[in-house]
Amino acid sequence: MSQKVITRFPPSPTGPFHIGNVRTALFNYLFAKNHGGDFILRIEDTDKARSKDEYEKGILGGLEWLGLKWDNKPTRQSERTKVYKKYLEKLIEEDKAYVSVETEGENKEVIRFRNPNKQVSFNDLVRGEVKFNTTELGDFIIAKNVNEPLYHLAVVIDDFESGVTHVIRGEDHISNTPRQILILEAIGGERPIYAHLPLILASDRSKLSKRKHGESVSLDYYKQKGYLPQAILNYLSLLGWNPGTDKEIFTLDELVKDFDVSKIQKGGAIFDEKKLDWVNKEHIKLLPQKERELLLTKDFDLKAVPKPLKEKICWKETSKEETLRHLLKVKEIISEEGD
């Protein structure tokens, strides 16, 4: 590619870091780095009522823990109100948007985009050609007022000003794409290339959601359970993508080297915690012995072992290093029995 590749990850800090969003961040990172490009981060916090600092910190901390380093100073939409206002005023001045008096809802006035009512098509890297008749969208709302932009306007302006070349996101955003293309054309922006990823599904093929599946949809849940960050990345990379070989265990560097967006599947990918367990075990085996011993014994509290049992498993003449190796072997045996 002659143009520098720039991808973005734009989470909303309205809840714990969802495992589906982790995969979206990963695929954006892999694609950018595979092409020698930049992976940028922005926080979409226009929902003032639901956005919280603790969720933003959780997202930033999660990305750092996973080793997905961004290449910019993270931006926040809440700090760019003046930028959006400038575009809104220009759209209104050019009669591409207008103030609408509403008869329903809490807002008496909103700003609507003047829909040119045409067919929009784009070539999706995962799904091929996608077409929409935008007449069905009507004149859609893009802001509550010039100081309160809504999602569709803010995301388009941010992508445009950041020079984003590729928008890689979940398939639940496909219906947003025609609106965003219309807005982008109205402000004179160049269209990015789109790739819409298959959803991550539960075992019953329903979409993973906190409401239905609880805390098990969050990154922190797996971090607290002791999974390695590299194992989580490895497993998530295989949800909707494969390298075209039988290889299943990858380091992050190997994923960057092998990642090919053309190998992303269209159908939903089922999250299987047992498979994650296996991937995690394989990554533990790859650790240097010292790291492996520390990892597998860090939560072992000898004081909590009943005295009769302690006398059977402890040897007064055994060094600390030998004891660690014994415990490591015991844990490995238990793990294998559990399989």
Where are these regions (language model features)?
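N-terminal Rossmann-like or analogous alpha/beta NTP/dinucleotide-binding catalytic cores
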Residues: S2-E102, N176-G189
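Short, histidine-centered active-site or binding-site loop motifs used for metal coordination
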Residues: F9-P13, I43-D45, I157, E161, ...
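Acidic active-site catalytic centers that drive phospho-/nucleotidyl reactions
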Residues: H18, E44, D139, D158-D159, ...
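Residue-level signal for inorganic ion chemistry
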Residues: N28, I59, L91, F113, ...
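Proline- and acidic/polar-enriched loop/turn elements at helix boundaries
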Residues: E44, T75, T103-E104, H196, ...
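Conserved nucleotide- and phosphate/pyrophosphate-binding catalytic cores
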Residues: D53, G67, D172-I174, P178, ...
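Active-site cores that bind ATP or allylic diphosphates and position pyrophosphate for catalysis
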Residues: Q77, A97-K212, S218-L219, P243
